[in-house]
Regions:
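Amphipathic alpha-helical interface surfaces
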Residues: 11, 27, 31, 39, ...
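N-terminal positively charged helical leader segments and presequences
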Residues: 36-58, 65-67
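N-terminal first-folded block
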Residues: 4-45
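Short secondary-structure boundary segments
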Residues: 47, 72, 93
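C-terminal structural segments of small proteins and small subunits
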Residues: 75-112
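Catalytic cores of RNA-modifying enzymes
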Residues: 1-5, 13, 19, 98, ...
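Mid-chain, well-packed structural core segment of small domains
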Residues: 57-85
Length: 112
């Protein structure tokens, strides 16, 4: 699979590095629990996020003031992290979150 958009490629590369460093949580349940615990500093949301994930994670993040960053497709995120499609990823490290914001469409947060 190719990702022609250089911003998406950079975001995926940073997510992969963060995941290997255990600074990225994946999946609705893990991200939701970390949001409730207050340990997530931003959430990357797949472009094709399901209504269920949007309801459970995106609204919770927005309600807690956690920035939401638009990502590529769930399939592209999953392929980079060696997992099936990943709709949401929670970032635990502030420096990584900053890098992801820079990579993600000029750093503009998405609407809930």
């Amino acid at each position: 699979m190719t990702t022609p958009d250089p911003r998406a490629e950079r975001l995926l590369r940073l997510l992969g590095l963060g995941f290997r460093a255990r600074q990225v949580l994946i999946g609705v349940d893990q991200v939701r629990a970390a949001l409730q615990a207050g340990t997530v500093v931003c959430v990357v949301v797949a472009a094709d996020v399901s209504p269920r994930a949007r309801e459970k994670v995106v609204r919770l993040a927005a309600g807690r003031g956690v920035p939401l960053l638009p990502g590529p497709s769930a399939e592209a995120i999953g392929a980079r992290l060696g997992r099936p499609g990943i709709m949401v990823a929670g970032v635990l490290d502030r420096a990584l979150a900053h890098g992801l914001a820079e990579a993600s469409r000029g750093g503009a947060p998405m609407e809930a």
